[in-house]
């Protein structure tokens, strides 16, 4: 049987929501443990220019923003770890979360901030140009393409409306 580690507050996910939760939990002396998941820093790490985040009037790169949030969470005592939640027993508290298939963490406070994952088409060089013309968020990046010809694939009516 796997050894069980007990923590006050467990956060799964390292995007803006995960790190913001970690900052607040740390300031509340909950000793948060945050597991980064598959993409440390979340989707923003693939964004070149973030101009709609408060506090950065000149904008900031996605990777830099996530480094800043990580540093602030660490400043307030967050234990940031690499690992992937592979199973969860949420039937009753304390909750049991399995990390990487073999480590079990038990917690009374669980924050799941796993965010979203963009669906790409699988075209050659698509990932190479992510954030440099290829975007997965019309709401986030539409501003950069004002008065330009664009192609929108997927998203139902949502992205088409965002483009207009």
Language-model segments: which ranges?
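Extreme N-terminal leader/targeting segments of oxidoreductases
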Residues: 1-9, 67, 75, 83, ...
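Rossmann-like dinucleotide/flavin-binding elements
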Residues: 2-6, 11-37, 130, 136-164
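Core beta-strand elements of the Rossmann-like FAD/NAD(P) dinucleotide-binding domain
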Residues: 5-7, 99-109
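Redox-cofactor binding/interface segments in oxidoreductases and associated redox assembly factors
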Residues: 12, 106, 112-113, 152
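Short alpha-helical segment within the catalytic ATP-binding CA
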Residues: 20, 44, 113
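N-terminal glycine-rich anion-binding loops that anchor highly charged ligand groups
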Residues: 34-46
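N-terminal Rossmann-like dinucleotide/flavin-binding domain of flavoprotein oxidoreductases
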Residues: 45-104
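Glycine-rich beta-alpha-beta "Rossmann" dinucleotide-binding loop(s) and their flanking helix/strand
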Residues: 110, 114-137
